[in-house]
Structure formats: structure tokens, C-alpha cells
Amino acid sequence: MKSNKAFENTVHGIFLILGLVTVACVLLITVYLVISGIPAIMEIGLWDFLFGKVWDPAASNPQFGILPFILSSIYGTAGSLVIGVPIGFFTAVYLSKKASPKVKEWMGAAVSLLAGIPSVVYGLVGMMVLVPGIRKAFNLPDGASLLAAMIVLAIMILPSIIKVSITALDAVPKEYEDASLALGATPEETWFRVSVPTAKSGIATAVVLGVGRAIGEAMAVMMVSGNVANMPKLFESVRFLTTAVSSGMGYADGLYREALFSIALVLFLFIMLINATLNFFLKGEKK
């Protein structure tokens, strides 16, 4: 009996340590980004840094305005959600509630494969197929644009949205659906008036995971967006927060390098804000 209690305490201790390691990693990343990012913001000025429209670190009078990057990231993420969320949501409803087991297995494997494709492959296919297609379709000088980034990101967030939404929908108690059907509701009415509302917290989590994937993506976006520090327009080349960091960190020094850490800090705060908003929403729904 004592040996079992000792084993149980040991396991609990190991789990506690692992949990503390996870928390410590988050705290260390936060502290490192704050320490590395604040000096540049202090030197440049918070207003000029966040709302400046010109990014030209190589000029004789360097300018470090990241408003084009912020807006490009927001517009690109929002556009990918507009495209990807409806597709992912309705696909999840179909696979969870309507598809035969064989179709569900086949499409589930395809979704898993889509999730495992490296970002650089998405970017390469987008650069070779999507970018020329946009250039020809809209008669543009260059198809590398915000629109191309939106489409690529929409495809990349589909696996997260579909898989998490399916899990949430599958977890809905069958008794709820049976009761709805017994009252005369059609299967479609039951899905969208009973199953989906019951699973809304899981579906919201799926969307937030998609947002995190979209706003944090760098390689694929850099390959299809043109990576130019312009104010965002749908058919023009743009640069996201992530691509600004990844494209400049290899050779940046001095204030330029510090400014890139500041951009990483802004990106980190964006993710924290999104997660906090989700938690607030879910707590409000539970009340």
C-alpha cells in the first residue's frame, strides 16, 4: 500500500515538474522578447514604430515604421479566415454527421496529409502555380500579392479547423440529436441547431488555432506575397510581421536587429491577445 502511494506521489511530482517546465518556457520567451524588443521601441518611439508607414533601415536616416507589416498581417489573416473557415467548417460538419465511414476515413487521411505538408512546399506550389495564375487572371505585372498570401494561408489553416471541429462535433452527446429528431427536426436542422451550438467552444478553438497558424506563418507567405514593405492592397506585394523578421534577421545589426526583435514582440502580443479574447469569450458563454 505504501509503495503504491509512493509511486503515485512520484508520478504526480513528475507531472508537476513537466507542467512547470512548460510554464517556464513561456515565461523565458516572454522575458527574452521584452528585454530584446523594448530598447528599439524606446529609441525609435512607440508611436513612430507602431504607426510609421515607412520601413527603410538602410537609409541615411533610417525609418522603422511597421504599420504596413501590422496591417498586412491583419488583412492577410482575416482574408484567410474568410476563405478557410467556411470551407473547413462545412467540411467538418459533413465528415462528422453525413459522410459514410469509408468517405470519412479517406477524407480524414487527406486532411492529415495536408497538415503534414511543409510550409516551403505550400510556398513553392503557390509561387509556381498561384502567383502566375493571379497575374494572368487580373492582368497584373506581378501576381505575388496579398491575395496570393490569403489563399495560401487559407489552405494551410484548413487541417486545423477541420480536425478540431470534427473532434468537437463528434463529442456532442447522441442523446441531444436523437431528441431533436424525435421532435420532428430534420437531420440538417439538428446539425445546425443542436450539434453546432453544443460544439461551438470547440469550433471557436479551431478558428483560433487557424488564426495562430495564419498570423505566425513566414516561409510560405514570403514566397507568394512579394515581401515588399507596402501598405496593404489586395493585388500588390506586401510584407507580413513574420516575413519582416525572417527576411532581415540573417544580416541585420545594430538598431535594425533590435527593431526586428521588437517586431517579434508585437507578434507575440498579437497571439496573446487572440488567446485572451478566446478565453474571455468562452468564459462568457459558460456563464
Regions found by a protein language model. Give the residues of each.
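Transmembrane alpha-helical segments of polytopic membrane transport and secretion proteins
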Residues: 1-19, 278-287
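Cytoplasmic-entry segments and transmembrane alpha-helices of multi-pass inner-membrane transporters
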Residues: 12, 87-126
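Transmembrane alpha-helix signature in integral membrane proteins
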Residues: 66-94
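Generic hydrophobic transmembrane alpha-helix motif, especially the helices
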Residues: 112-157
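Glycine/proline-centered hinge or cleavage motifs at structural transition points of membrane proteins
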Residues: 118, 183-184, 197
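Transmembrane alpha-helices
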Residues: 164-165, 187-222
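C-terminal transmembrane helix and the adjacent membrane-cytosol boundary/short C-terminal tail
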Residues: 166-170, 174, 181, 250-287
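Interhelical loop and adjacent transmembrane-helix boundary motif
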Residues: 221-268
